[in-house]
Amino acid sequence: MMGDVWGEKDTRFAFIGLAICSILGDINRIKVEPIVEYVEKCMNYDGGFGSSPGGESHSAQVYTCLAALAIAGRLDIVNRNRLSQWLCERQTQPSGGLNGRPQKLPDACYSWWVLSSLEILGNLHWIDASGLASFVLKCQDEENGGIADRPNNRADVYHTCFGIAGLSLVKYELDGHTLPEIDPVYCMPVDVVSSLGLSHGPSGWKSLLPSHWL
């Protein structure tokens, strides 16, 4: 899908286009099937997705593709177990953090990109949740607040947002309090998604899943 007047194509735009139309309640305004076909061409032998056909699998692209396919009602084309295995391999040791692709350093933002994808796939339990939570908490700026990409780096709003979203997905609890539940498709609190009329049924985002996944 093309994202600007200069013709740039990227699977991120597939998700963005579908999400915008879905949020506006006008999904039929966009041609869904060509988007699905493009996303499918970006799927790799390892189960992951690249930014374009033949591109290297990347955790952030995996999320955008899964979320796009979920909104389109076409998660059936995904190799669920193979992709889940690839995503689990993103957890690094001994840090417990997640990276975007092989041989890269862990980064707090992948707490969202990887975990949201595993949640959609129904295999979030394959990850060491306590190890991941420990890594994200170590990325905090104890004096000024916020979360950085890695421990001892400067915090920013980007990593703070996705670090907290990741903690929500693993149901991190502190002093008996948990974070609001996050919808893994839209990256918004579940109650916000519901108020916008995006729940897609009584089961919320799970109504978007293929029946044989449930």
Where are these regions (language model features)?
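Solvent-exposed loop and edge beta-strand segments that line ligand/cofactor-binding
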Residues: 2-11, 49-59, 97-109, 148-156
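Solenoidal tandem-repeat scaffolds enriched in leucines and small polar residues
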Residues: 4-61
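Alpha-helical membrane segments in multi-pass integral membrane proteins
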Residues: 11-15, 35-36, 40, 59-63, ...
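Short hydrophobic alpha-helical segments of the AMP-binding
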Residues: 17, 65, 163
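Aromatic-anchored, glycine/proline-accented short structural segments
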Residues: 36-103
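Terminal, non-catalytic domain-edge segments
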Residues: 68, 73-93, 103-214
